[in-house]
């Protein structure tokens, strides 16, 4: 499978234009494009512009409603519950975290939960919204069921990611991971490439290890059995029960407290009905913020400077690889495979846009 490099600014403008065609206003279009490009810049191809075709289909089918306005259904000084009414997940998520941050500025802590939403992209984006306000940020989301429980072969939980961010120097601490071995998007990348995925990522309809990404995706879509494994793989000996438990905790912190559909019931009604939660904490409520920031910065540097394993020259802390990736891709362009490139052109064609007139395409070296 061939890869191409697309200029970040041109691809961003294209995504904003696409969102405008769907009926999103200027700020919404800018936010959605920023979240998509943030994923690609950070090296998270699975959550970047390759998602655009799925969003396009979601808008066409009515799963995503561009005209939906998230509604406050319950609120306290410290918390708020939003019904997204099948809005674009990014729109509801930005709204929710902005509300959580506003509450944290006033009271030291703010929480927002959302139900009846859609896929919201890369979770770290929202945690970093709080970090930029010199706060600790966290967010969680459930997804359509894609993960089998330990010893199971029926998908019951989503990829259910955890995102956490806190200010530090010279770069923030950012942790953003699925509670599955990999997110669905990673399987989609392998399926598009026609390559076998690593064993230990997923199981087939019989609960057996498989390297066939397309087969797993097809089985998930058709409810034929099999799915992605929780963090730790298939056995408690390698920690499978830990990933399974973390996925369940995220389910509680998203769908259960938001009053939404649990992962195994998401999308059964044909509407956007994922749930999310967002937390902002002014950590100054515990003491001297500058001292805490310095302490975290020192710890992170000590981790980087600690003894390396044989053959290794660098130890990374959470968020470092993303910073390195962003710098490289801003300079050299966003890498996009030929399958995703074809999908970007298809989206444009169906919306009356000439992709190649808007975005320069060059073969990756």
Which residues make up each language-model segment?
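Phosphate/diphosphate-binding glycine-rich loops and adjacent basic-rich segments that engage nucleotide
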Residues: 147-221
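A generic, well-ordered mixed alpha/beta core segment in the N-terminal half of proteins
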Residues: 79-171, 177-178
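Residues forming anionic-ligand binding surfaces in small-molecule and nucleic-acid pockets
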Residues: 73-79, 83, 94-110, 210-231
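Active-site cofactor/substrate anionic-group-binding motifs, chiefly glycine-
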Residues: 47-101
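Secondary-shell segments that build the walls of catalytic and ion/ligand-binding clefts
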Residues: 196-265
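Acidic, glycine/proline-rich low-complexity segments that act as flexible tails and inter-domain linkers
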Residues: 1-8, 13-32, 37-38, 46-66, ...
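Catalytic-core signal marking the mid-to-C-terminal active-site face
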Residues: 2-14, 21, 252, 257, ...
């Amino acid at each position: 499978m061939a890869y191409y490099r697309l200029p970040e600014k041109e691809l961003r403008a294209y995504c904003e234009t696409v969102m405008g065609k769907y009926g999103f206003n200027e700020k919404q279009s800018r936010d959605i494009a920023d979240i998509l490009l943030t994923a690609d810049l950070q090296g998270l191809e699975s959550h970047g512009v390759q998602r655009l075709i799925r969003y396009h289909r979601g808008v066409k089918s009515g799963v995503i409603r561009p005209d939906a306005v998230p509604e406050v259904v319950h609120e306290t000084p410290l918390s708020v519950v939003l019904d997204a009414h099948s809005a674009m997940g990014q729109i509801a998520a930005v709204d929710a975290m902005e509300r959580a941050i506003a509450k944290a500025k006033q009271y030291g802590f703010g929480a927002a939960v959302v139900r009846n939403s859609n896929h919201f992209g890369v979770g770290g984006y929202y945690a970093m919204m709080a970090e930029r306000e010199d706060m600790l940020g966290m967010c969680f989301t459930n997804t359509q069921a894609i993960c089998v429980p330990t010893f199971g072969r029926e998908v019951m939980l989503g990829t259910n990611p955890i995102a956490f961010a806190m200010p530090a120097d010279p770069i923030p601490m950012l942790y953003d991971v699925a509670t599955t071995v990999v997110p669905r998007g990673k399987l989609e990348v392998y399926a598009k490439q026609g390559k076998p995925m690593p064993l230990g990522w997923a199981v087939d309809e019989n609960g057996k290890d498989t390297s066939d990404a397309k087969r797993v995706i097809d089985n998930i879509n058709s409810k034929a059995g099999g799915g992605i494994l929780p963090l730790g793989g298939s056995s408690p000996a390698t920690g499978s029960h830990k990933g399974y438990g973390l996925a369940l905790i995220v389910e509680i912190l998203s769908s259960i407290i938001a009053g939404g559909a649990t992962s195994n019931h998401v999308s059964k009604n044909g509407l956007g009905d994922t749930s999310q939660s967002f937390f902002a904490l002014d950590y100054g409520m515990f003491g001297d913020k500058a001292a805490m920031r310095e302490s975290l910065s020192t710890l992170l540097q000590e981790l980087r400077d600690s003894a390396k394993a044989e053959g290794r020259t660098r130890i990374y802390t959470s968020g470092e690889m993303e910073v390195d990736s962003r710098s490289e891709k801003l300079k050299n362009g966003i890498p996009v495979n030929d399958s995703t490139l074809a999908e970007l052109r298809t989206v444009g064609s169906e919306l009356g846009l000439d992709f190649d007139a808007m975005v320069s395409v060059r073969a990756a070296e």
